[in-house]
Amino acid sequence: METILQHVPVGQKVGIAFSGGLDTSAALRWMKNKGALPYAYTANLGQPDEEDYDAIPRKAMEYGAEKARLIDCRPQLANEGIAAIQSGAFHISTGGITYFNTTPLGRAVTGTMLVAAMKEDDVNIWGDGSTFKGNDIERFYRYGLLTNPALKIYKPWLDQAFIDELGGRAEMSAFMTKEGFGYKMSAEKAYSTDSNMLGATHEAKDLEHLNSGIRIVNPIMGVAFWKPEVEVKAEEVSITFDEGRPVAVNGREIADPVEMFLELNRIGGRHGLGMSDQIENRIIEAKSRGIYEAPGMALLHIAYERLVTGIHNEDTIEQYRINGLRLGRLLYQGRWFDPQAIMLRETAQRWVARAVTGTVTLELRRGNDYSILNTESPNLTYAPERLSMEKVEDAPFSPADRIGQLTMRNLDLMDTRDKLAIYSKAGLLSLGTANALPQLDGGKK
């Protein structure tokens, strides 16, 4: 059964994820002229660079949409962002600086909520602006078909007729002007930007070259902290969690998760917190490069992980991080709602997050420079008296106890010596004149 349509479905309803930009505007009008019945759906994801959401559906109607709807996706996006924090669903990092999978989270919400809205209007064909080289074409495909098994996909950017007529932005602008809309292209930037309430992605064009970097980016969620003329004052902030959910900032309770992220974005953004430069593997295994912003996610992540390390034992933390790496990849691949992802996420939310209650106080400076000033929780297993270097009453263990514990180590030490001897006889290790222990033999064997 054909799922992807390569030609305009004449006379049929076609839902388009409509941003109001040149690409989707030209695509909507072009489909209308070719005989399709375009329905426009716009996701309100709280994009920091979007000034007037209500104007977008009106614009779609002007361009020929049969119907245009604005879908408020912010509450769902905020909750998915918190779920990602709780489960540590992040697999891409460089030098300890994390990418918080904000675009994959946005696609999970957009792909499900827009297709659900289309089903309400009996629209079973969906198009969006993703290209064949990127991740989004697969993410939207998966989420769309999960939500509506009867869904067909029509993307003008996969239709050769559309490409031949409107293959570039100059052609699209000329087409819209000819149609009487006087659409002018916005000034070309040195890179492209995609954003939602959780974070922003800057990529492509000049940023495809690794000798261009963060210094050419104009942040939309924070400040250009690398510029010496940008003043950034140190600031203290406290974040409170209750059973894994953020509930207060600086002592002020915030029940609405959307408002929580907006407040954290404001605070973190004043410092440029959460910006990172990453080289990553796309779903198709080719490498790409992006520069990311996520001030609110970064604040939550730092505070949450501080409580995790103070509350849980080493084995739990290890499993949380291993599962988080795997879950981050699944999220990146468009599998956030697949059973294997739900299993990993639910495990972390139930057995890790539910114990995470407390308050962490930070001092934020420039960029990702911060200090942890205080950690408070009724669930802390950190107890300074257990390992105090001072003499304490009722010590949890004595020198004699430690002697016994060390003596027990002799068992595995004997086994280790025997194994090293076996490897030496096999030629895998050699005894050097300056070494008391066997060394790897330079990879010769």
Curated annotation (Swiss-Prot):
Pathway: Amino-acid biosynthesis; L-arginine biosynthesis; L-arginine from L-ornithine and carbamoyl phosphate: step 2/3. This is Argininosuccinate synthase. Signal peptide: none annotated. One of its GO terms (cellular component) is cytoplasm. It catalyses: L-citrulline + L-aspartate + ATP = 2-(N(omega)-L-arginino)succinate + AMP + diphosphate + H(+). Its main location: cytoplasm. GO terms for molecular function: argininosuccinate synthase activity; ATP binding; protein homodimerization activity. Belongs to the argininosuccinate synthase family. Type 2 subfamily.
